[in-house]
Amino acid sequence: MANVKLFNQGCQEIGTVDLAPEVFEVEVQPELLHLVVRAQLAAKRAGTHSVKTRAFVSGGGKKPWRQKGTGRARAGSTRSPLWRGGAVVHGPQPRDYTFKVNRKVRQLALRMALSAKLVEDQLVLLDAIAFPEVKTKLMAKVVSDFSWKKALIVLPESDNNLELSARNLPGIKVVRQDMLNVYDVLLHDHVVMMKDAALKVQERLGHGIR
């Protein structure tokens, strides 16, 4: 069992939590993490880039000058790719960059990412963070107390006060546990999980492992 310290939002240690080794103590395979991150970033691409070929550039129907006798090079159209304002050859066209990664592979990669954070002592467990109102100053104090520079805060469920309080803090991102992904985990220096969120992630990622 992975024994992890549990803190309150005042940065005081209040106990420990045992986390399942099949989720938080998995051997890390960098090539698998790389594959899943590539898939995530590829899925974000719009793929709307487009250039005009000779079929779509306006004009250029008339031969600019006769074939022989002018002393100039032969030209059949002012929209040739050789000309300024002409068409583009083999340029980018709209396309879909997404590629499939199996669900079990994505889940394994997430377990690896969380395991890496635990090994590097960058996984923080909090009992809870609760604010009576939306106040950036309250969240800024928590961040300052823990000395977080770039942190991913994982909640068991949506918390409007906390999410809005953290929205303007640079380097701080708040997500629900069901939206946790490999790219966000690796991108941030610290992964801060509420205890209930960690247990839900453990249940979800540990289900069906043999």
Curated annotation (Swiss-Prot):
Recorded coiled-coil stretches: none
UniProt keywords, alphabetically: Ribonucleoprotein, Ribosomal protein, RNA-binding, rRNA-binding
Alphabetically, which GO biological process terms does the record hold?
A: translation
UniProt keyword 4Fe-4S, yes or no: no
The record, for SUPFAM superfamilies, names:
Ribosomal protein L4
Q: Where is this region: Disordered?
A: 56-80
User: One Pfam family this chain carries?
Assistant: Ribosomal_L4
An annotated Gene Ontology molecular function: structural constituent of ribosome
A GO CC term?
ribonucleoprotein complex
What this protein is reported to do is described as: One of the primary rRNA binding proteins, this protein initially binds near the 5'-end of the 23S rRNA. It is important during the early stages of 50S assembly. It makes multiple contacts with different domains of the 23S rRNA in the assembled 50S subunit and ribosome. Forms part of the polypeptide exit tunnel.
How does this protein assemble? Part of the 50S ribosomal subunit.
Q: Fetch the HAMAP family from UniProt.
A: Ribosomal_uL4_B
Q: Which family does it belong to?
A: Belongs to the universal ribosomal protein uL4 family.
Designated name of the protein: Large ribosomal subunit protein uL4
Q: Which organism is it from?
A: Solidesulfovibrio magneticus (strain ATCC 700980 / DSM 13731 / RS-1)
